[in-house]
């Protein structure tokens, strides 16, 4: 995060027409973003950081309301039989990922498992957590690489659990097709990169006009019913 804060400071010093910044850790990045705004640089946050965006002076946020997405995932998992879950989280400091877990937990009681982002470590920690947790019948993996590694752990243990995930990858799509993942939540990252640039263009060329609210890019469910259609858009609209 320190390197990212330094990059924000360096970019702001060039006085760009605008900056689009992901905000995974408001405490670590907030001062750099406030300084950019104070220097007259229009800032739009994207992906992570919805709750802190306005307080740091950003014009708006483009991204998925992560708590809502977690709530949606949890409600669906509960309707599909989940009663007790582990939430596999690769960045315990990332407020967006925490929100996914906590939103899910409104419908399905859950405990956090800090997996780190290393695939081998994810599988090892997931295996240990699944073995140690009595009564767990569901898992939420809040990133695609986490989803793939956790699926391997579940397979190796010979367990049958409800597994749902966040975000897309070829591996996640294969797991959905094989019936090993019930669904994944698509936050449409392409829109998170595209829409802020459109908004900044309008802001800089349209007398400072902005949309009337933040732009939500998700959540959307991808499951067996639509996975092939979504996969066909890879590299085109995703």
PLM features: what roles do these ranges have?
Residues 9-38, 104, 115-175:
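Hydrophobic alpha-helical
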Residues 69-73, 92-110, 125, 149, ...:
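Short, solvent-exposed amphipathic alpha-helices that sit
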Residues 17, 59, 83, 137, ...:
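Conserved acidic residues
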Residues 107-108, 191-238:
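Hinge/cleft segment of the Venus flytrap/periplasmic-binding protein
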Residues 60-85, 120-123, 168-172, 187-207:
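Hydrophobic alpha-helical segments within soluble ligand-binding/sensing domains
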Residues 44, 162-164, 182, 222:
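Structural detector of well-ordered beta-strand residues that form the stable sheet scaffold
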Residues 31-68, 169-177, 181-182, 232:
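Flexible loop/hinge segments that line or gate small-molecule binding clefts
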Residues 23, 59-60, 84-92:
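Short beta-strand segments enriched in small/hydrophobic residues
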